Amino acid sequence: MALDGERGEQEEEKKKKKKKKKRKKKEEEGAEKSSSPFAATMGEDDAALRASGRGLSDPWADSVGVRPRTTERHIAVHKRLVLAFAVSIVALLAVTMLAVLLSLRFDECGASAAMPGTDGGLGGFPERDSNSSFPGSARRNHHAGGESSQRESGEVGTPGTPSAQPPSEEEREQWQPWTQLRLSGHLKPLHYNLMLTAFMENFTFSGEVNVEIACRNATRYVVLHASRVAVEKVQVAEDRAFGAVPVAGFFLYPQTQVLVVVLNRTLDAQRHYNLKIIYNALIENELLGFFRSSYVIHGERRFLGVTQFSPTHARKAFPCFDEPIYKATFKISIKHQATYLSLSNMPVETSVFEEDGWVTDHFSQTPLMSTYYLAWAICNFTYRETTTKSGVVVRLYARPDAIRRGSGDYALHITKRLIEFYEDYFKVPYSLPKLDLLAVPKHPYAAMENWGLSIFVEQRILLDPSVSSISYLLDVTMVIVHEICHQWFGDLVTPVWWEDVWLKEGFAHYFEFVGTDYLYPAWNMEKQRFLTDVLHEVMLLDGLASSHPVSQEVLRATDIDRVFDWIAYKKGAALIRMLANFMGHSVFQRGLQDYLTIHKYGNAARNDLWNTLSEALRRNGKYVNIQEVMDQWTLQMGYPVITILGNTTAENRILITQQHFIYDIGAKTKALQLQNSSYLWQIPLTIVVGNRSHVSSEAIIWVSNKSEHHRIAYLDRGSWILGNINQTGYFRVNYDLRNWRLLIDQLIRNHEVLSVSNRAALIDDAFSLARAGYLPQNIPLEIIRYLSEEKDFLPWHAASRALYPLDKLLDRMENYNIFNEYILKQVATTYIKLGWPRNNFNGSLVQASYQHEELRREVIMLACSFGNKHCHQQASTLISDWISSNRNRIPLNVRDIVYCTGVSLLDEDVWEFIWMKFHSTTAVSEKKILLEALTCSDDRNLLSRLLNLSLNSEVVLDQDAIDVIIHVARNPHGRDLAWKFFRDKWKILNTRYGEALFMNSKLISGVTEFLNTEGELKELKNFMKSYDGVASASFSRAVETVEANVRWKRFYQDELFQWLGKAMRH
């Protein structure tokens, strides 16, 4: 038995060796076959067939028996087949060689199908459905076989033997430059001649653009941006001596929104060429590109066409090099019906009238400029006009009825003064001969700073003194100040790329406050209102683990829209303010003057700014490396919290530490970008020491380490320490509990020892530190006990803004009344002292008592919001009087408060009355507050009705619908309704607002920021998963915010209510 067993094993071993030899032979034969490109292709095709279900799956293939064919007849047949196969291979090789010699590429064959007059010629208008193909895009060439499917997917074949390795990114960019986010830089536009004909009766337009281009590097492709345009004809020519450059074809590549022109020969470097494109497109009903809007006058609906090109939408109106670095001059001509007028960046040079009722306006040539602030409009508006000291003509265009009422006079007046202010401050004259301000009914943003033609939504520029409050006047003023600043920061000097968009938006936002201080010095905006309206607001957002640096890489097309958020605007402004304060304002101003002078009509990056400012400091005898300091603030996300531990030794030394401030500490451990990182900032910490009657002079300490010891003069056991004086720095300050107690005692005994700004800063820091768990919950509530003695607006405003999110966290709790009563107790004394305003404005909004009136408004709003009985009674009486007499005697500065309170307290008839007034009024400021008042109702049926009406553009303007949804979400009776409506209508909302910069993020944040239960958090996460990748950054912030809300309630709400219970019993 044993021998038999050994023999069996030997026979088995022989069988295994035979099988191994056969397998090796087959593998060698297979390798020979696979070395042939044709065989490789066949193998790939076979795999593709199996993957698509048309080939046999593996189980089915295993069940098919192989039948031998060994007769001579079959062998002869096989020989003939092999011979035929060999002949076909030779023929294929010959054709391939011929194609190589003629430089024919498969992508050109596909492109030729898109040429006019050939198969696949262009015509008609672009489809509005983003999923459908664009006219003029790459179409299937039926004579090119399988290559067309490659072209449509962006994989364009090249002649030659297939490479075993995939192409590198550099190689891919060379032969597929249209697949890249950025244009290649081979071509540079020098000048555009753009001729448009607008057909307002059917909302279409035709265009012809001639672009003079300089060729930097030899190329056979002309790649420029184009989207939603139907290209009819493309021509390329050199100068007169050389003539036309043959065009092999052209196609649109929607993935990167470019038009690709394929040439039959290479463009030579260092030569100039002319590119001519004839196209047509729609005047869209959306809010981007060249779009239409309308208004009703005397019962007649009238239309207008207007543009919004920032950041990447000029390509929707004409083919162009649509990146900020590609500056060129523009000569625009617009043909339209004579019943309209046209506007653009420059004045009209000549107008040619035709017998058929059409006119062509030819505009003067622009200076060098980027495409995103090119603009034009076609409307039948009228205007008012003024002229600056330097001769700049300023006009305001608006609806004829608004011009007749004088609604644009205020904006016109301050624009003239602001141009003169900026010319003096920057020492750089305004660069164009005119500046037009255009007020339109519908626009995606408050305003757009197009050079020489700034476009505003009506609510942010038209002001009727008879119905506008001081708050509304302030809003209008600051928007105008912002946009006029852009004529220098953004238009004259433009960021190189969108990663540094804060270089224009941050400066414009900062100068909102500097410019308003020039107009109204008593308002003291930069030192006071900047804190609550910019610094405190953006630090809430930047305290999230999902935040991002103010300068962030833009790697994908979708990233461009994402950089336009409050981090770029408000954090950019806050960092600029910090920089101005530690440099000194006069040195900072001289640095800005040099920056604008050096880079005017060009582009600049952040390092250009840092170098210029460092040089300004050096000339003043100070040697600070601005780039080294500011890179930490612009290239790192978030901000630090400084903790000061006072008098730790007998030598008057304090310990100062810094760490990254995060609201939800749990989120910090989950955020990958924060793990194993050690954020450090160079922090200009200003500090004072004080007691009940005296405050030391200000000292500055540069903190650059995690922890540092410093000696402080005048420090004793009874003295307190205060850091970040007047909150000029972009960071929070925490103290040991003993120092907090000393500061609270100082506020209660004599709050005026601390400046107004310092009092507001203490309130905001305390609430934020408690919210994040750095402080006990009672500290901020103890601080606001002194408010009964506070006579200044800013600390009240800081307290109101800090209490608002806390109120929304608690407003659905059973013991909410304890918190409500505590706040009413702090408000009651000041409410009684100030009383209600009288309606005696006599047409003048700008009063010396601005601060007093804003304080009164803030206290009345708190009193009515938290249920003060007298406040409720007063609001109800004013509303009832208006309804019964049909005369509105409600004081202007509290109308929004009264409207909201009345709708909340009274019956459905009041809601219907406000709804009627919303439809009948023509004053844009009144219309806005009436619409918002409708969201205050306690009636859920009315709130649901309003939400549904908000999506009807004939009833509620597109830009106002977002505000309706957000305000319903802020109402505790409507929060769940708005959240459900948002989810149900998300596809509609995303389609409408998805491309409009941060409108989508505003909506997502506004609807979700006060969700605070485990169930709501789960709903949000599930909803986010179902739309994976859509608005992902905004949804990530929303999830983190709701997680922080849930976490705070879990860990801190009991602590808060326990302290409130004790406080209310004493």
UniProtKB/Swiss-Prot annotation:
The keyword Disulfide bond applies. Residues 15-25 have a biased composition (Basic residues). Its EC number is 3.4.19.6. It is found in: Membrane. Residues 1-81 are cytoplasmic. Residues 1-14 have a biased composition (Basic and acidic residues). Keywords: Aminopeptidase, Disulfide bond, Glycoprotein, Hydrolase, Membrane, Metal-binding, Metalloprotease, Phosphoprotein, Protease, Signal-anchor, Transmembrane, Transmembrane helix, Zinc. One of its GO terms (molecular function) is zinc ion binding. Substrate binds at A446, A447, M448, E449, N450. The modification Phosphothreonine is found at T71. Glycans are attached at N131, N202, N217, N264, N380, N647, N676, N691, N705, N726, N842, N948. It is an enzyme of class 3 (hydrolase). Pfam families: ERAP1_C (PF11838), Peptidase_M1 (PF01433), Peptidase_M1_N (PF17900). GO terms for cellular component: membrane. GO terms for biological process: proteolysis. Residues 103-1066 are extracellular. Belongs to the peptidase M1 family. This is Thyrotropin-releasing hormone-degrading ectoenzyme.
